[in-house]
Amino acid sequence: MNKFCLLPFHGKRIGVANIPFTILFKKGPCFLHSHITAVYYSTKGKNDSHEQSRVSKKSTFTPLETPWYLRIVDNEKELMEGKKNNHHTMNKELEIPKTSPNSLRKIADLLTGKLGLDDFLVFDLRKKSPNSVSAVNKLGDFMVICTARSTKHCHKSFLELNKFLKHEFCSSAYVEGNFNERQESRRKRRLARKSNLSKLLGRSSECSAKDLNSEAWYMIDCRVDGIFVNILTQRRRNELNLEELYAPENEKSKFQNIDSGNVPTISGVNEISSNNNILLGLRRLAQQRRRYSTINPNGLSNLRYFLQKEDFKGANKIIQSSSGTETHNIRTLEHVKNTLKDLVGQERKVDVVQWKSLFDEHSTFLTINQPAAYWPLRLEYAILLNKADPQFYSDRVFLKDYLLLKKSLGQELIREDLIALLEMVLKTQHSSHSYFNLVKQNRVIIRALNLFKGLQTEDDGSVVYDEEVISLLLNSMVADERVKLRSLYETIDHIFQTFGDKLTSGMIVSILQNLAKIKDWNKLLQVWEAITPTEGEGQDKRPWNEFINVINQSGDSHVISKIVNNGHLLWIRRLNVNVTPELCNSIKALLKTAGMENSTLEEFLVRGTNNQ
């Protein structure tokens, strides 16, 4: 074997490394081997001496091995195939209660298939025993629980599920746990304050903000066949353990979270880090936000002085100079309201436009964030504005300025809000009582009633069917004898069909008064006889005193004689009506108008009852 070396070319000022190649000739095939050779040269002085150091390293290649950048594609394919296989096996193992509706199967396929939610469970709440009935049974028929990978996954799953329900079942889902942008920004501010406070206290707050933003629980009412869907992150699902709540009594032991004590919660971490240090607690109290008002008493007197003079520029300067916490702003608005109340009580003419703009200008987001204190205050202020100028601040303005505003800000309307609107409708004066003006008022009421759909009172009854609300609604349908809405009779029939024997005295009196106002005596007697109890049902509890007063105040001799001669008053004795002194006086006044004073009938009704 002959060996030939290709020597490098020697030149001056060369500072690079030269790579010599060695060629080996054999009788067989020719192979090329490379040796990495590093050569360094020095040209200082006259005598050029070079120092050469060689470091050789052989690189071996395996022709059959696939490079790493080609193996990525294969690994991704294997991973995707594994996910598909797991998905198919999960669908096979998906257990849905028997005799369940087809909608549950479609929703389950969407959650586990397209949305990729894990740990899918369905609880059938229809077959609960009577001994274990709770609030959970009243929610729906099926409870679905599944796990998402993150909070974004929860939110995206809710959006896709809502879109699916609208397309397939024409239903819009109701969700709890979905934070909008305003609530999310508020939560971030609270977390920032908590983080700053923790730094001042020497505590670590790295886990608090991160953990709170990484956990979520969405409870969705599909409004389809009583199906509820709970989408949770894994940690939140372990903490809440909803399976134990929804499971039957004989299966609750299967879902008991035995290792729940090992899962550290945020409050637990903070409690451990504080080490129950009393000094840290005192420092926290010293540095926490003060909740008392720091307004100057002289400022209140000056504000009242400017408001009584209706100098709104001076009042604005005082309010802006002393602006502070949410509690302080609420107290300032209360002071403005009390001043307006005094002026309206004195029947002074006030500039309603300026008073309204003053209240709106200082109703900031900090103030609205206290709904329990702000909205009752705004309602009372709106009633005062309507009392001061019903033409400017009418029922239409109240609908937009209060009801729609409160509803759009996510607050729940209450019974007092609807009553305030109906009272404003009745107080609003028109130039003439015409049918078209009555129709305009009715349109405002219809728009308001649409906002109160589904709202319940404290007695689990609808707000619309409240006794006072019904009375005001009937009064708003009648202006005088000639002007009335055609829907009055339909409303009365609907009230009778809805309540039946459970009609209250207030509802009956309101119906009688409105029928007497339009002088429809036939309908009035028809209503009165329709609610007459039979003799075997016991004592008659109808409002006899109000009925006789309505008839007597009509002044119609024909109607009065018809009531007396047809024997309507005899039912007082037949049904054992409790004759009070007020009822005795009403009977005497009615018989006196009919010309039967001191008659045998009066003695039979009044004196005979007193003797018993």
Curated annotation (Swiss-Prot):
Keyword vocabulary terms for this entry: Membrane, Mitochondrion, Mitochondrion inner membrane, Transit peptide
Membrane topology qualifier: Peripheral membrane protein
Task of the protein: mRNA stabilization factor specific for the 0.95 kb OLI1 mRNA. Also involved in OLI1 ring formation.
Source domain of life: Eukaryota
UniProt keyword Plastid, yes or no: no
Localization in the cell: Mitochondrion inner membrane
GO-annotated biological processes: mitochondrial gene expression; mRNA stabilization
Stretch forming the transit peptide: 1-14
Gene Ontology annotations for the cellular component aspect, listed alphabetically: mitochondrial inner membrane
Family stated for the protein in its record: Belongs to the ATP25 family.
Species of the source: Saccharomyces cerevisiae (strain AWRI1631)
PANTHER family per UniProt: ATPASE SYNTHESIS PROTEIN 25, MITOCHONDRIAL
This protein's name: ATPase synthesis protein 25, mitochondrial
Tagged with keyword Lyase: no
